[in-house]
Structures are given as C-alpha cells and as structure tokens.
UniProtKB/Swiss-Prot annotation:
Protein name: Der GTPase-activating protein YihI
Source organism of the structure: Histophilus somni (strain 129Pt)
Domain of life: Bacteria
InterPro entries in alphabetical order: YihI (IPR007336)
Spans through the membrane: none
Complex formation: Interacts with Der.
Lineage: Bacteria, Pseudomonadati, Pseudomonadota, Gammaproteobacteria, Pasteurellales
Length: 186
C-alpha cells in the first residue's frame, strides 16, 4: 500500500480550528447540514447554555435594576390592607385616632373590689404577716418595708371603720374575763 502525504485541508472528520471558523450563514439553504457543521453548531449552543452567572468585573459596575422594576409594577388594590401595622409597639395604652380613654376608668375598676374581700386579702397577706412578725421580734425594717406595713395597716383600719368592725383591745378582753361569773357555765 502506498503512503499518502498529510494535508492541511479541512474535512468532515477533522476538528475545526479557531482561525478556520466560518460564519454559520454560509451554510447552504434548503440542503441538509453536514456532520461537521452540525458538530460546530452544537458546540456553540453548548457554550451558550454552559455559560452561567455574571460577566467578569460586573460586581463593581453592577446597577440594581430590581428596585426600579418593583416601583414600576402596578400594585393590585385588592391585595393586602392599607392600614399600616407597627412593627414595634411603643405605647400600649395609646388610643386610636378619634378614640378617648377616660382616665378614671382604671381607678373605678380598682375600687370595685368588695371591702370585706379586700380586708380578708390584707389580713391573709403573707408578706405583711411576715413583716409584722419581724417587728414583734424586735427587728428593724428597711424604709420600703416600713412604708408598706404602714400603708397596709392604715388601709385595714380604714376598711374596718367602713364596715363597722371594731378591734377589741387586750384590756377589754381581760375585763370581760374577770367579770364573767363562772357559775353561769355550770
């Protein structure tokens, strides 16, 4: 078999060099593309598909177009509420516009407690009883504790006067004990 000299001629089986690239428009209209042309075309399409992301250096010169797009869109008036919702609640008892919160309403609710019930609550108050026990033991109380004890005792005296309950002193109890005739109980 005779040897054949290598040629630099482009054939269908040879890969295309960058310098040999032909524009795709030169393909024959109406005729079927050759295998070589189909391969070149598919390679170009693959490059286009493979390319993702931003161009080189676009990080520094990129302009946010997303903000302008959002502003240009028309909002549907049926969607969402027009009333603005505060993210941080600053004033809990702040009235709405046009509404009025009477200042005496809170005081009236506090005063509606039954005096007898309030008296029993004060008498059964554990912290007050503990502070009174400490006073009886001869300990000195702090200013806050002394003020608390004085306020509670004043309120108890006020409620007892309001209900008509009189506190019997120890001297009265001794007198009644001494004056009792024991023969009555036999």
């Amino acid at each position: 078999m005779a040897r054949t000299k290598k040629t630099r001629r482009i054939t269908d089986i040879m890969p295309m060099r960058k310098t040999d690239k032909r524009p795709e428009n030169l393909s024959r209209p109406g005729k079927k593309l050759t295998r070589y042309e189909l391969d070149a075309k598919s390679r170009e399409e693959k490059k286009k598909k493979k390319r993702k992301g931003l161009t080189a250096g676009s990080r520094h010169s990129a302009v946010d177009t997303s903000k302008t797009i959002v502003l240009n869109e028309k909002k549907d008036p049926r969607v969402g509420s027009r009333k603005k919702v505060p993210l941080i609640v600053e004033f809990v008892n702040k009235p709405e516009k046009g509404m009025f919160i009477p200042s005496g309403a809170l005081e009236e609710k506090a005063k509606t407690i039954d005096p007898m019930l309030e008296l029993t609550q004060l008498e059964n108050n554990e912290s007050l009883n503990q502070l009174l026990d400490e006073l009886d033991a001869g300990k000195t109380l702090s200013k806050k504790d002394q003020i608390f004890v004085n306020q509670c005792l004043d309120r108890i005296a006020q409620l007892m006067a309001e209900l008509g309950i009189e506190e019997e002193s120890e001297d009265d109890l001794y007198r009644t004990f001494e004056t009792i005739d024991i023969n009555q109980f036999k």
